[in-house]
């Protein structure tokens, strides 16, 4: 490992060769000299690839991963590496060369050191949860690192995506990834900063990355490593990339991350020495264009690297708060130099996420990317690929970032404001897309976008930070998830997606890995798997899936895809399990429809991988990403949860839209870009709706994933398994799949396309990956074509969003995708189908709201009387009470108990009604009130009253008289007693002698008088009362005369008779 520590500046790994990046020289020695590091790392150069692989899967890296103390800032042993990074001043601005044209030209990403820093978290603050609007993204600029990344639009969108270039790593893809990674790295690096240099070696980086992530120290230089080119666009950009990759302070890196493509900035993240890696990219760029298109970072070779790095890295990342970063870094480190850088990301991915979390987190994703990148770089060829994916992921640095939502942080890019992804993405996106290609993961693109989101990221990373901790890889995933949500749409899930993305990228072959990444958000685990990466990757994906699910429904789906190969079954399961949680997210994902969403994470992964291999893939990637972003918000991360929550589906919708944009597969990259663009363009930026974005992703992913798979497939398979063990169980299946897939690539591919459309499919694709790029493209195109249309349709259904997206996918998937995929798709789609029927989602919700409001009003009017309320309650009470009293029984002692029914208390209020009618208690006009006129009763009427004769008899008077008589009698009795007493007490002779006796006598006398008086008065009253009856006879005569005859019917008469 020590070699890792300081990669030998001397020779960059082959991949790196082209751009050895000054890495060693310019970047921090440790980080940057990717080549050297890489070599040292394991075999560095030549060996590197294998080594990486080893590392990833089972080699040192993984252990490293395991080892990485989550907490430790210092990168593992590698830590030393970090110091080297040191050199880059935090403030150093990084310029990203023109990323893809798409990217906004000259998007400067300036990140304040702070932003960049691990503090990323703080960055997040900007908008912790909500996706940051583009402006917000800007905020990210806060990134500590002063890094400024300028993106040149100029970069052509070449699918090649210079991303790789960016990576600078040889591993183009790697680079891209790198960038992504870088971004992540930034953060990672930051972590790294902690004193020790990162080791490029898996170890270093990872550690460093973690350290960087930790952000703890900006010191590390972050290499911007911008992937400047966004990745797609200009392959040429790579150079830019290099530029970027200048070691920027780690913090800056973060910033970089911000940059969109350059976002690669992630590179900044790269911050790590990786920079050098990036350099490689440049060379790569060209390649990138080619197959690299994926650019990617593709760096196929890297794929191996990927495997290597990532895993280890992830752990590291986990360790650092940056965690994500660390791990990422760690992993990266493992990878080649370049790779390492990338790797960093990769590992970083998870880590990055974490690290990045703050910043790039996304990078973390990148991590995946990174991994890829790194890997790539390492093995430029293969390795890179792996990385690449991530790369593009990274590439989207942002992407990666995205993944991690951390990246989000980075997102600083702000650019993205756009929907989740932020238009930025547009440019970025294109990048992304291309990235995607290189990234391989669709996500990447999206991711990239995400990256932008990343700004959001700041927030994002917050989340993910936390997540990280759990485990390197898992962290990321989890982290992501959280982040994702918080992050903008893009991150969205995905973060998970992103993460996954990266992962995938990294995984490349493993597209899965990406997936994992996605999960990363969720699981991150996958990421970790990165290490497995490649192979593991596959597994990772699965795990990602598992993870993702949480974040994204898609993810859940993805798994299936992954599963597709052999895993399929397992994967799906995982998915499902996971999925559920995410469900809401998922739905959005579904929305994404494109599977994208689902795929989001997954897809990306897949794509990324493929992408690495093909451009087309890239497109997919994009879609995926979008979906992710869309989804994320839905997930609830949305800044304005209450508002948005209501219609989470919408998010999905956004995704959908994106999908449409994508053009034919071949154009995948382009398409992706377009989509991305649209996404970013869409006003919805902050909104959760990233619909557009999603779509894009979808398509490409398919291809990509295939490719990646193939890449990894052979190499990684074995390795993969180990990772899987590491990962959540779900991951394992993936791994397996990865291993077997190589041979099946073609078949897998075919499935994949379908799958891609369906989010789940994407996953699948990844698994299958092994197919050659060409195949990929074909499949992709096939998928794409149909998918897109589907998607469009979906779009309309936004409201249904969630469900719908799914449905869209299914169609495609079914035919193309493997059965398991189809299943997944179906699952996803089903809901959509159900949903579809409705109007657009927006309207529907309104409708519901409307109904609700009216209902409430009605309820209030009708029910709200106190009366009713009380009755309702009383009824309940009564019911309870009725039950409670037992039937009557006699106890042992013979006492009889009878149940008593509680009766409501008698109140004047019982019949009081107080309805909510304003006029109820008020008279509005004088005419409302009339004085009641008393009628003088006519004799006839009186005579006809009921009981008149009885009254005339005076029975009441007699009754009263009798009672008065009783009173008189009582008084008379008292009077007699008093008289007797008085006579007994007072002897006539001594009457006056005793005062006491005298007083008693007086009192008795007084009472006697009172009694007489009362008796007299009562009698008087009684007499006068009875006088009323004196006229009785006369009255009765009149009554009988007038009353009776008149109204008696014949029947009554007969009865009387």
UniProtKB/Swiss-Prot annotation:
Residues 1-68, 289-314, 556-594, 624-692, 827-880 are annotated as: Disordered. Coiled coil: none annotated. InterPro entries: His_deAcase_cplx_SAP130 (IPR024137), SAP130_C (IPR031963). Residues 41-54 have a biased composition (Basic and acidic residues). The N-terminus may interact with a transcriptional coactivator. The keyword Lipid metabolism does not apply. It is found in: Nucleus. Belongs to the SAP130 family. One of its GO terms (cellular component) is Sin3-type complex. Residues 289-301, 671-682 have a biased composition (Polar residues). It comes from Gallus gallus (Chicken). Residues 579-590, 624-642 have a biased composition (Low complexity). Keywords: Nucleus, Repressor, Transcription, Transcription regulation. This is Histone deacetylase complex subunit SAP130. Component of a mSin3A corepressor complex that contains SIN3A, SAP130, SUDS3/SAP45, ARID4B/SAP180, HDAC1 and HDAC2. Acts as a transcriptional repressor. May function in the assembly and/or enzymatic activity of the mSin3A corepressor complex or in mediating interactions between the complex and other regulatory complexes. It comes from the Eukaryota. GO terms for biological process: negative regulation of transcription by RNA polymerase II.
